[in-house]
Amino acid sequence: MVTGKFLREQWAAGNAALGLWAAVPSAFAAELMAIDGVSYVCVDQQHGVIDYADLVEMTRAIEGRGVVPITRVPANAAWLIGRALDAGAQGVVVPLINTAADAAAAVAACRYPPAGVRSFGPIRAAL
């Protein structure tokens, strides 16, 4: 299985990562976007019309094709970031980061204590 670590390794090696953005709520469309040669598909919950149930199904479809599922959450809120990660997103794009404090809050929302504030509820990981 390809994981978010794959993207970090690609970027660390100076390689580009080709990604696509999904803004409509369709697991089938997300699976079609996860074609060979694509490194990630980002499910856009900020400007797309995708709810939590759609996110779960879309991340499963993307991951099933061996592509990294990430999501752009609607806002820099710890509960939204944690919920996206619990749904199966292997990375998050957090909008409206304007200060160092905003960035620190977003990072803390991705990490479990003591390094962060993310609560434990890995719904997808428990399956």
Where is each model-derived feature located?
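Active-site beta-loop-alpha junctions enriched in small/polar residues
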Residues: 23-25, 46-48, 74-76, 97, ...
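Conserved anion-binding
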Residues: 79, 91-127
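Alpha-helix-loop-beta-strand connector modules within alpha/beta enzyme cores
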Residues: 52-78, 82-86, 110-115
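N-terminal amphipathic alpha-helix/helix-capping segment at the start of soluble metabolic enzymes
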Residues: 1-19, 23
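Short, acidic/polar
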Residues: 22-35, 75-83
